Amino acid sequence: MRVFVCAALVLAAACGSDSGSTTPTSHNKSVDVFALSSAFSPNFVQIAPGDTIRFNIAPAQNGEGHDVTFDATTGAPANIKVTLNGVIPRVFTAKGTFHYNCFVHPGMSGDVVVQ
């Protein structure tokens, strides 16, 4: 009888549930947005909190640089000053819709939706 009880206890312990002791991994992604001559491409991006947008900036056809200026919205990332070349990342941590413009080129704008 003792052997049966011990075997039952060992079997029950082996069938126990997972304690969830594994560390969850982050699955944040990065999305590239390109500042073309007079447009952002893509000009609409939908991401999750913690994701990164990499703004790829190159000179416009006339040699002018670009800026990325976000509307004054709570949670918006820092603006990007006028630059000629570079890949400038911005991490979006807050949920919401974040509209941005290039003031060097009127009409050049985009939106990031974080949900």
Where are these regions (language model features)?
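Extracytoplasmic copper-binding redox domains, predominantly the cupredoxin/blue-copper superfamily
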Residues: 15-115
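Sec-dependent bacterial lipoprotein signal peptides
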Residues: 1-14
